[in-house]
Amino acid sequence: MSDQFTLPLRPLIEERDHQDLLPVEIAQISAQWGSFRDVNEETLRAKIEEEKNKEYTIDDEEGEGASVDLDTTERLDQLYKKRAEITQFAMQAHMEAMFALDFISLLLSKYTPRQAETSMSAFLKQVAPLGSLTAELVNPPPKSEAAVRDAKAVSRGWRLQSFNAAADKLLKSAARLETEVASETRYWSEVLAVKDKGWKVCRLPREGQALGVQYGFLEATPIFRDRGLAALRRSEDGGLILDKGLVPAKAKTVRVRVKNRGVVTGCSKPYRSAVQDSESIEGRILQARDTLYEEELFYELVREARIMGSQGVSTGQNLVQFSVSEDEEVLLDLVDPDVAYADDSETSLEHTVVADALAHSIRILLSYAHRQNRRRRTQPPPPLTQKRRHVPEYLLLRPTMAYLQHSFHVRWLESFLGDVYGVLRAAGLESKFTATPYASVDLAHIDRSVPTVEGLVKQFLLPLESTFSADLITPQTSFNVKTRTNLLVPPFGTHFEIALNMPHYPDVQPPSRIGQHDQVAMMVTHFLLLDIVSTISHGQGQPVKSETKTTPLSWEVTYPHHGELLAVASDGRQKKMKVQLSRSELSVQMFETHGTDSYSRLVGAEGGMLPLPSQSQTWTADAATPHPSLMEFVASVSKSA
């Protein structure tokens, strides 16, 4: 069987996967047949018959050709020859096209060298320089005089039109340039005015062509430090526009209120900038700076309050609250300066002053924290570590609370000692006490290595101490009370330390640390009671002259801690004296006793063992009528019958 090789010369007709759209088919029919008016049934039938006859003719020719049995080698040779001819024709066409392209490119290089060079071949670039070929008209046909005149008139018109257009463009450009110069002059003059007033003007980090003003604090928390840079935009007329970015449009300020027994009795004054015109560029910069500072202040207050929950500090929605005493508390919130601050009918001058002082204090402490950040940044950094360094909370609430609590305890102790010693003076017992508030604050020895302001603030960040020195009635007896408040390191809060010097009761020593007012009051009155009992037993005071010749009774202390003394007369009669001391009064009661009851302790009336006193005397600090002194009363009851 002989091998046959057939090579189809027609392109294969593939079935389309999708039908042509109707508009496409209509376009094809129009391109093939022309207008639909020229197409009728007879024309179409004739065309169909013509196509059928053509197919039959081609099939017959192919059938006859296929019947010829050619040798396989000859067919392959013919195929290779045909392919070589086709390739040669294609290469020749390509070369002719490239020659034509080089010719056109070289011709155009006379007028547009850069554009023409991109389409030239490398060989042509080497052998022919750019612009070496040009074209011109040779023996142009003569033109009539009318055509020449028309050409000159047209060219003159085009030149005049071009000159007018150029003049209009120049005038418009000059006007626009004048406007731009005026705008730029105004813009740069306002920028220089901002710089001359001390503000830092620099380029924006992400916009190299824009200027910005640095009104924030470089040592602030990163989220507020990055917001402290605003762009200085130029308006259409050249005015300066401050693009504040994330800073709110309205001003904000931290408000401090003092609430006493559930009623707001004091409020700080809203902080306002000293600039008269708030709409000026400086006024807007100051407003943005102050608002950013107030937001950072409240942010740090809330951040510090979250770690002070165990010390009575609570936070709410836009509110920080802490108690100073049982009746007094302080509230801090971030509000609009135009909001109503407090009811004037309930305002107390003292609490208003306290609120203003607290508002100034927390702002000063935040500025001090910024300075500490700057000082820390200028020092050598600590060793590198994989652990993330914790940013400590600023000392804003803790020093403020320490001062308020310490002031409250100092005022209470001073008032208590004043009342007790007033009672003693009313009883004729000469004694006094000396108060030294804030003894730990030594302004004379401020650290000189730092600025004065920082050294002054540093004094109030230390634990606060106040001392009270009191003399007792008996000579060489005294006691000291030291009030110490610390909210930075444990133990937190206010503690009282009492030191006692009482030679006649050497075993009596107070606790090392007391934290309650009631305990302090009890200890102080107890020491004074012991000293009064000792004074009576030793007969201190002025002797009382008596007309009768009687021997005064000698008092013996039986229960010193309960203020009880016993006296036995020469005839065997016995008397008991009970001394009671409180903040408001000093009372002395005399009782007649018999037998073994003399050495038993007196108890309250509810016990059923305390008889009615035979004599008694009470002294108060605000007594309207004069009374005999304590020693005079003791001398009068010490007469034996």
Swiss-Prot record:
InterPro entries: Mediator_Med17 (IPR019313). GO terms for biological process: regulation of transcription by RNA polymerase II. Keywords: Activator, Coiled coil, Nucleus, Transcription, Transcription regulation. One of its GO terms (molecular function) is transcription coregulator activity. It comes from the Eukaryota. Residues 159-186 form a coiled coil. Its main location: nucleus. Signal peptide: none annotated. It is found in: Nucleus. GO terms for cellular component: core mediator complex; mediator complex. Gene3D superfamilies: 6.10.250.2620. Belongs to the Mediator complex subunit 17 family. Component of the Mediator complex. PANTHER family: MEDIATOR OF RNA POLYMERASE II TRANSCRIPTION SUBUNIT 17. Component of the Mediator complex, a coactivator involved in the regulated transcription of nearly all RNA polymerase II-dependent genes. Mediator functions as a bridge to convey information from gene-specific regulatory proteins to the basal RNA polymerase II transcription machinery. Mediator is recruited to promoters by direct interactions with regulatory proteins and serves as a scaffold for the assembly of a functional preinitiation complex with RNA polymerase II and the general transcription factors. This is Mediator of RNA polymerase II transcription subunit 17. The lineage of its organism: Eukaryota, Fungi, Dikarya, Ascomycota, Pezizomycotina.
